[in-house]
Amino acid sequence: MQPFDQPVIALRKKILELHDMAETQGLDFKEELNLLEERLRRLELDIYGNMKAWNRVQLARHPERPTTLDYVRLICDDFIELHGDRHGYDDAAIVGGIAMLNGQAVTVIGHQRGKDTKENIRRNFGMPHPEGYRKALRLMQQAVKFNRPIITFIDTKGAYPGRAAEERGQSEAIAKNLFEMAGMPVPIISIVIGEGGSGGALGIGVCDQLLMLENSTYSVISPEGAAALLWKDASLAEKAAESMQITAPDLLRLGIADGIISEVIGGAHLDVSLQADKLKSVLEQKLAQLTRLTPEQLIEKRTEKYHQIGT
């Protein structure tokens, strides 16, 4: 299946080829390039300005979409990754550690996908085992001990559903994280940067502020899974995506998300540095607001936030 924005991709490629030809052959294509770039701007507005839910799902899953580590390395200084759950395991599908954000020490945790087949296998395609959630909880408890704000990056299809993961307590690990995060006396900000899939996302997603990138999704099940359950046909995923209300605008309207971070036109993968700047700006603003609250106020407001969802 071709991407929905294939005409834009093809035109961008043509413009780059013309730029290269002008440089290598010393030819003047200024007029032609101006026309093509104007045509590209109109095409981008037409396609990206009228996206449906399934189009956003495609962008959220883009193989070049920035990951947790991409953002952490761009928005934070002195990041030190910490490993292991202290029970003999280190799940590479969840990364975390301590870093400095504008001079303030923070704990950062997030799902981590791979950029190629080899890394995806090592990171289990960003689907954590229970040990990943236990590692995340260990880092969050450490953040509480040292009074550090917690920032989590959500980007997973879901917790790994394999038999071994279930035998080692997948449900218990996620449930314990939900319980513990609800009462942590430090600011917690969660950002959905790609896919937010079911309990696998919630396992690091109980927070004071839930932010979503413009083209991210957050849902109890994938569109393919919903289509298979509802209509016994996973190929109806596009239809399911439209009815599930899983996009950032949907979730903001429903009171689940607390804010949307705008994306670079065409998706975050097209300019990772600019996207990181956008994310950092909003993150700093939200962090400044939350750090002014007392621990008691944080827990009270967090509890109220979740009580209001669905009412």
UniProtKB/Swiss-Prot annotation:
EC number: 2.1.3.15
Sorted UniProt keywords: ATP-binding, Cytoplasm, Fatty acid biosynthesis, Fatty acid metabolism, Lipid biosynthesis, Lipid metabolism, Nucleotide-binding, Transferase
Its job: Component of the acetyl coenzyme A carboxylase (ACC) complex. First, biotin carboxylase catalyzes the carboxylation of biotin on its carrier protein (BCCP) and then the CO(2) group is transferred by the carboxyltransferase to acetyl-CoA to form malonyl-CoA.
GO BP field: fatty acid biosynthetic process; malonyl-CoA biosynthetic process
Entries under HAMAP family matching the protein: AcetylCoA_CT_alpha
Enzyme type, top EC level: transferase
CC annotations in GO: acetyl-CoA carboxylase complex
Reactions mediated catalytically: N(6)-carboxybiotinyl-L-lysyl-[protein] + acetyl-CoA = N(6)-biotinyl-L-lysyl-[protein] + malonyl-CoA
Quaternary structure annotation from Swiss-Prot or TrEMBL: Acetyl-CoA carboxylase is a heterohexamer composed of biotin carboxyl carrier protein (AccB), biotin carboxylase (AccC) and two subunits each of ACCase subunit alpha (AccA) and ACCase subunit beta (AccD).
Cell compartment(s), UniProt: Cytoplasm
Coiled-coil intervals: none
PROSITE patterns (alphabetical): COA_CT_CTER (PS50989)
Stored InterPro entries: Acetyl_CoA_COase_a_su, ClpP/crotonase-like_dom_sf, COA_CT_C
Biological source species: Exiguobacterium sibiricum (strain DSM 17290 / CCUG 55495 / CIP 109462 / JCM 13490 / 255-15)
Pathway(s) served: Lipid metabolism; malonyl-CoA biosynthesis; malonyl-CoA from acetyl-CoA: step 1/1
Sequence similarity: Belongs to the AccA family.
GO molecular function: acetyl-CoA carboxylase activity; ATP binding; carboxyl- or carbamoyltransferase activity
Hydrolase among keywords: no
Main location: cytoplasm
Residues covered by the CoA carboxyltransferase C-terminal domain: 32-289
Record's protein name: Acetyl-coenzyme A carboxylase carboxyl transferase subunit alpha
